[in-house]
């Protein structure tokens, strides 16, 4: 019996170290008081090396979004003498190129559907108004990115309430805001009128082309009927 105990004791001494090191524990709760080593399971934490990006308002209003689309379509002039479908195909190729540069992981159809959905968001609407007025807001966006990069959060905690309103002229500020608001409303109304006028002209052009295509089809049908009559004679 002593020889068996010596054998097992030596086996315990000669056992290779556990890969878990100090985390291995001994369990003495088995039957007969036998000792066995119980190693805890490895806990694998799921970490995302590259978080999944989504096409959102920030990307659409960024440098690769609407601003890039305007540059892409800047030199595009459809030829009224060409086939409308050919002009449409050229336009869609430019949209596809823009969508690929903005968000390469999505198909063109999905990008356009997503852009249509984002167009109803307040942030995108405000950006469009500012963009039409020539106020892109790149400086404020750049400043915000720099603050986020440096870990600076402006919560107004360091501002003194007395200093905030110390040099604030009440009447002048109110009058200036009212004037700026009126100018902004006038510019927005002018832009809306221009957009409506362009849309009306495009709609008239489309109807005219449809009418011409219909008349051409009627003439072709008439010529075919005339040819059939000659063949019958």
Swiss-Prot record:
Protein name as annotated: Protein TIPIN homolog
GO cellular component, one term: cytoplasm
Pfam families xref list: Swi3 (PF07962)
Superkingdom of this protein's organism: Eukaryota
Region: Disordered, residue numbers: 1-39, 134-233
UniProt feature, compositional bias: Basic and acidic residues: 163-190, 197-216
Keyword Cell cycle: yes
Bias kind Acidic residues: ranges: 1-14, 217-227
One GO BP: cell cycle phase transition
Major subcellular location class: cytoplasm
Species whose genome carries this gene: Caenorhabditis elegans
Family: Belongs to the CSM3 family.
Subcellular location: Cytoplasm; Nucleus
Gene Ontology terms, MF aspect: DNA binding
């Amino acid at each position: 019996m002593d020889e068996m105990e010596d054998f097992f004791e030596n086996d315990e001494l000669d056992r290779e170290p556990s890969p878990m090191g100090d985390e291995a524990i001994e369990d003495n709760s088995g039957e007969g008081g036998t000792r066995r080593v119980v190693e805890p399971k490895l806990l694998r934490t799921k970490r995302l090396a590259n978080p999944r990006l989504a096409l959102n308002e920030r990307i659409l209003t960024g440098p690769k979004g609407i601003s890039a689309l305007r540059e892409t379509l800047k030199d595009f002039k459809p030829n009224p003498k060409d086939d409308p479908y050919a002009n449409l195909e050229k336009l869609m190729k430019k949209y596809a190129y823009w969508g690929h540069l903005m968000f390469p992981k999505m198909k063109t159809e999905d990008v356009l559907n997503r852009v249509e959905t984002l167009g109803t968001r307040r942030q995108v609407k405000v950006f469009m108004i500012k963009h039409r007025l020539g106020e892109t807001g790149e400086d404020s966006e750049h400043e915000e990115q720099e603050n986020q990069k440096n870990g600076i959060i402006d919560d107004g905690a360091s501002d003194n309430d007395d200093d905030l309103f110390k040099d604030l002229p009440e009447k002048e500020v109110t009058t200036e805001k009212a004037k700026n608001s009126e100018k902004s409303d006038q510019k927005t109304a002018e832009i809306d009128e221009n957009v409506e006028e362009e849309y009306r002209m495009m709609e008239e052009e489309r109807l005219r082309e449809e009418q011409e295509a219909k008349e051409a089809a009627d003439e072709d049908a008439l010529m075919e009927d005339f040819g059939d009559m000659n063949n019958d004679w």
